[in-house]
Structures are given as C-alpha cells and as structure tokens.
From Swiss-Prot:
One of its GO terms (cellular component) is cytosol. This is UPF0250 protein VP0718. Pfam families: DUF493. HAMAP family: UPF0250. InterPro entries: UPF0250_YbeD-like, YbeD-like_sf. It comes from Vibrio parahaemolyticus serotype O3:K6 (strain RIMD 2210633). Disulfide bonds: none annotated. Belongs to the UPF0250 family. It comes from the Bacteria.
Amino acid sequence: MLTINSDAKLKDLLEFPCSFTYKVMGHAKPELPELVLEVIQRHAPGDYSPKVKPSAKGNYHSVSINITATSIEQVETLYKELGEIDIVRMVL
C-alpha cells in the first residue's frame, strides 16, 4: 500500500488527472467484481467495464479496472479500501 512517505516517487511520475489501472486479486467469488466497482464508484464515479480473469486453477480471479485519477490521495484511498474487501488478497 502507498503511504504519505513512500509516494514521493509516484507523485513525481504521475501528472493528475491521469489514467490509472488497479488490478485486484481475490477469491473466485461472483461478487468480487461488484465489490471492486462499489469501492471505485465511491471515489471515482464513472461507467466502468472491469476485466475479470481466472487463475490457472480457478481458485482466484483478477479484476482490472482503469480510472481517471484526480489526485495522489484518491489513488492511496482506493488502494487502501480495495485491500480491505474481505475476499481480496492483493491490490496492484
């Protein structure tokens, strides 16, 4: 997860607003994409079409979603809240 102290380089690389992709990996549950979209809509409302890919064994799914980020604070908040979803194991 990004923190206030570790995001200096990320801040330097990004010019807001910008396109930003989140990849959320979690248990292969049908509600995973809906839970991810719910968090995204709270902080970056829009019309999204997440891409869902199953793992090789089918135990996990990855949900990729692209947003228009408006600030580093928004990026950090989304990383934090997406990671707090119960069935999520990792956010990239």
